[in-house]
Amino acid sequence: INSNTQSVSSKILTTKKTAIYREGIGCTLVGDNSGISDEASLRRQVMPNIPLLALDVNTPWPMGQQGVIQKLSPQVFSMIDGAANIQFSENKTYQVATHSIAIAHKGELVYERYAPGISPQTPLYGFSLGKTLATLLAGKLSANGELNIHQPLANQVWQDVRADISSHHLLTMTSGLQFDESYEDATSDANMLFVADDMAELSVNKVANAPAGQEFKYSTANSLIFAEYLNQQLGGLENTYSEFQNLMRQISVNNAIVQADGHGTMTFGMQDLISTRDLLRIGQFMLQKGQWDGQEVIPEYWFDYMQTPVAATMNAENSLKKSYGAGIWLNLSEPYGKILPSLPEDAYLGLGMRGQYVIVIPSQELVIVRTGTTLD
């Protein structure tokens, strides 16, 4: 551990890896002689300065930093707090480790609770919540004419059936690429991403299991390929970073980081950090179908697109066989059953590994965030 260089190195046998911290983009893992980006060149790569918003401490969430304004009845508060007590307790056969819970109703912060050491502004790992962030960025770029989601990527290495893959297929997990998303096997594709210098290259080289659009298979590879495609379309990491952070500022989000790999690809879908209140803002933004502070940030049709269930055959290897839209899971009864049985049919959610949830319930004007490191 080197505090002066803000880096951590580890070595197993002949393999050495170093993680370096860079302002604005978080930590990047690089290896010796990777042939991609050495540590020195990565440190010379400085992200554009996107100023933070000066959110007033006396202005209520979501436009300011003020906390809960108590409007719940004692009965409702007791019910919610009782449920939270269960989430924060460890008297179960598996690790719960809840970090935070926050609830917004009708656009107001009505409940929040944090584990010791966690604050409303603490950036927390969202893991696959980054897939939702990537889809929101795609909506912004699509509306601006910077991205055609139905245009084939035409990746030069794809000279077979994969040549038909578009951003739409990547966002809806219907690319047809064969990718092992399991985490139980240490050598699975998903686990290999954590030690890869170029995550998109590892993903691009996967073979096609089915033609694009015919099969739903949830895979982080789709999000990483999409992120690399954004770099190509926008002119590199710095521009992709700027587009993402500018979108976040438009919806009052200051504490959101999507880290980059050693090749310079933002790792949407697995290495994102965002604070609890900012996750709640993301959910509120989706509930409002792209409206923020009286302005249209992303057109309403994009959120209809996100909530359109994928019409493709379910791959048997999916660990979660539920309805998916674009970047979000849908709480539909048919054809696979609800992902959250106690919630209404119109509910949808961003979902990250180890229990990261951003749940939106339009019919109740409700947004719920839960973060943690739950193992089950």
Put a short name on every predicted segment:
Residues 92-100, 115-144, 150-161, 211-218, ...:
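Short active-site loop at a secondary-structure junction
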Residues 159-186, 191-214, 219-224, 274-277:
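Conserved catalytic neighborhood of penicillin-recognizing serine enzymes
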Residues 1-119, 147:
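N-terminal leader/targeting segments and the immediately adjacent pre-domain N-terminus
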Residues 75-83, 108-113, 186-212, 237-256:
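Short, charged, amphipathic alpha-helices and their helix-cap/turn boundaries
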Residues 253-260, 308-367:
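Active-site Gly/Thr loop motif
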Residues 135, 222-231, 270-292, 356-372:
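Active-site-proximal alpha-helical segments within enzyme catalytic domains
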Residues 107, 125-148, 170, 226-230, ...:
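Active-site SXXK
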Residues 143-177, 205-208, 234-274:
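Active-site helix/loop module of the DD-peptidase/beta-lactamase fold
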